[in-house]
Amino acid sequence: MTDYRTLFSSPGAGSTVTTPITLSLLLLLSQATSDPCYDPGGRPRFCLPPVTQLVGKAAAPCSQTCALPAASPGPACNSSLTLDLDGSFLLTSVTLRFCTAGPPALVLSAAWATGGPWRPLWRRPAWPGALGGPKKVTFHSPPGPKTRIVASYLRVEFGGKAGLVTTGVRGRCQCHGHAARCATRAQPPRCRCRHHTTGPGCESCRPSHRDWPWRPATPQHPHPCLPCQCHPIGATGGMCNQTSGQCSCKLGVTGLTCNRCGPGYQQSRSPRMPCQRIPEATTTPATTPVASRSDPQCQGYCNVSVSSVHMSLQRYCQQDYVLHAQVSASSSQPSEAVGPEWWRLAVHVLAVFKQRAWPVRRGGQEAWVPRADLICGCLRLRPGADYLLLGRAAQTHDDDNYDPARLILNRHGLALPWRPRWARPLRRLQQKERGGACRGLLPPTRSPGPRN
């Protein structure tokens, strides 16, 4: 291996020859490794792939015209020729070669998709008394960014017999100024995108660089895609919306870059959950009165309070309904008294895992809770929270407001804080019930009423 120190040593044998050669090689190497889409300082700039010979698919009409004598009538000629470029390209020139004098009139059109609409690019009208045109016709795309022609199909309409020999179409891939290289033979042609763009034609930004909407590059401004400014803790990742730049935020986090806590949340010290819900101090009867737990009349009234339940098939079948619901967090009137014995709560049913005789529909519902159950703290419901509700259908009641279609929440059921991991096993139990697994498993008898 050559030591570079010998190439730039003091004059001696061969040093005057090797120094210019080495400088030339280094210059060529720097030109080969430089990126046309970036200047020497690393700043983005407008770039285009080189012009290449494009491949078209078409059969030249009247291909035997050149071999026929001049006096021979010859076969009937087609009136047009369509070229499929196998992709979208920026056209630079179209060349048509004829074996005899070309047709007196020609019309060249371009289209984006199969069947048009066709856009006329060049028209050569027939002069009165003209017998034919030249044997070679070349169309050049006009210069300027506003006059660039993007086409996937070309159509040539002849005004007479045409003995067409070859068609030459030159152009470059449509990379919107964001690429200097392109695989023209790929299906579809794919640009080697720069400026953090992506897509076959560099027509969109990468998911991690969508701080501004995508724009094509121009010689005046390269319009590179900018990285998303997502907060490293408040966002779920580094990707943002293509149009607005909105980052995907964690629960309780808001803002375009996920940099602050939303309403009802406060900052925490956990990087996994940077915003936690603010505990609500509420006086609604839906919460548990602490003083009522020492009331002698409430001793032994409620069922044993549990925080978790093993949901076996038998326990599931013994329930009249199993719901995933959310207690309304409205601050106007989440609950109200209805008569001396009942309170009415607004709930939103999110999922029904077991249906009762009177169907419970998803959406907004009115849940009825006995006043005594609330006073004794049998149900601990917090507005805005999700719960798994296990309960029994209403039975005969002496109250005039009784309705068998009511959704009753009482001390005989359970209201457990919802856990997302419960959804899948509950769906499996629901499928078993539909298959008849609950037949013969009757619910146990309920207690007749409160004990004094």
Curated annotation (Swiss-Prot):
Transmembrane segments: none annotated. Its main location: secreted. GO terms for cellular component: extracellular region. Disulfide bonds join C173-C182, C175-C191, C193-C202, C205-C225, C228-C240, C230-C247, C249-C258, C261-C275, C298-C376, C302-C378, C317-C438. It comes from the Eukaryota. It is found in: Secreted. The keyword Nucleotidyltransferase does not apply. InterPro entries: Laminin/Netrin_ECM, LE_dom, Netrin_domain, Netrin_module_non-TIMP, TIMP-like_OB-fold. Disruption phenotype: Deficient mice exhibit ectopic motor neurons that migrate out of the ventral horn and into the motor roots. Residues 1-34 form the signal peptide. Residues 173-227, 228-277 form the Laminin EGF-like domain. Glycans are attached at N303. GO terms for biological process: neurogenesis. Keywords: Developmental protein, Disulfide bond, Glycoprotein, Laminin EGF-like domain, Neurogenesis, Repeat, Secreted, Signal. The keyword Secreted applies. Residues 298-438 form the NTR domain. Pfam families: EGF_laminin, NTR. PROSITE patterns: EGF_1, EGF_LAM_1, EGF_LAM_2, NTR. Plays a role in neurogenesis. Prevents motor neuron cell body migration out of the neural tube. This is Netrin-5. It comes from Mus musculus (Mouse).
